[in-house]
Amino acid sequence: LVASQVSNAVMGFISNFQVALNPQITKDYATGNITGMERLSYLGIKYSFLILFMMAFPLCLNIDYVLHLWLVDVPDYAALFIILIMIDALCGTLFGTPFMTSLSATGWIRNYQIVVSCIILCIFPIGYIALKFGCSASSVFYISIFFTLIAGFVRFLFCRSLIGYSLKKLIKDVLSPVAGVTVLSLPLPVFIKYHFLEAQTLGNFISLCII
């Protein structure tokens, strides 16, 4: 429940940002401006990821402090579940609302909805099987992350097939920049956290957020 509350709060902010792009994406398709539509979709995805990353990374890095500040009794595995949910949300953002809006603008959404829905629904039976075979509860979140990425990439393939989106542009304009920012942002705060600011204090939390 705690993990879901954190996820809903963060994703609500991102959804409001992405919704603002929807009218222009639809308008670009209606006027035949596919290049502008694709560019706006990639910009929306990139900035959504970066905004979410800036919110999620400090939270995950200081998750124990935040949970103890928020709750009296922290549920078992709450910290791990929140971190995994944030990772799942970041993966979903990479292939999220702008692609959905793009496909909706075409009107050809039946096959797309069927395929992507089936992929997402696979999380439930496979997660159940994993738990029945004695896997930890966190395994369900790992399974969710995997299928979120698969569903997202399939969503892009439909955009490529129906609209003409370019994989090369996706890599150049979205995946490469966000990968670069993510990789470069991780080492220093993590090093400082575990070598200089291990104590769970408000001052250390604020310092890490600034870094």
Short names for language-model regions:
Residues 14, 38-94, 121-129, 182-191:
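Alpha-helical transmembrane segments of multi-pass membrane transport and lipid-handling proteins
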Residues 110, 117-153, 160-161, 165-167, ...:
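Membrane-interface helix-loop junctions in multi-pass transport and translocation proteins
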Residues 5-8, 43, 56, 65, ...:
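Residue-level recognition of pore/gate-forming positions within transmembrane alpha-helices
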Residues 3, 7-45, 98-105:
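Helix-loop junctions and terminal segments of transmembrane helices
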Residues 1-8, 39, 73-82, 204-207:
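Interfacial/gating helices of multi-pass transporter permease domains
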Residues 1-19, 23, 51-55, 85-92, ...:
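Transmembrane helix-bundle signature of multi-pass secondary active exporters and lipid flippases
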Residues 1-9, 27-28, 64-74, 193-197:
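Helix-terminus/linker motif at the lipid-water interface of multi-pass membrane proteins
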Residues 86-119, 163, 167:
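Membrane-interface junctions at transmembrane-helix termini in multi-pass inner-membrane proteins
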